Amino acid sequence: MKTQVMTFRISNSFEEWAKHFDSHLEIQKAAGMMPLFRGPHEDDPQKVCIVIQISDDAKADAFMQEHEADILESGHILETTEVNKYL
């Protein structure tokens, strides 16, 4: 299992983004993704960090591709995403 740390910017409030993110928890879990943390940067509420445990990289990548429209709708600015994976 890997731990993935993602940071990115959002185009709306953290509360709006978080509500959207949380509404997809069941399908994230079905894709082998277990969110551990989500929060805004202390000095910039439009910069977000999420930490997720991933059981299968291929399933996680497929989830991101399949749900790209939903991710964009949440306010996530995809081109600002930085991803780091840890063993």
Language-model regions: role of each:
Residues 1-71, 79-87:
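Short S/T/G/P-rich N-terminal loop/turn motif that feeds into the first structured element of a domain
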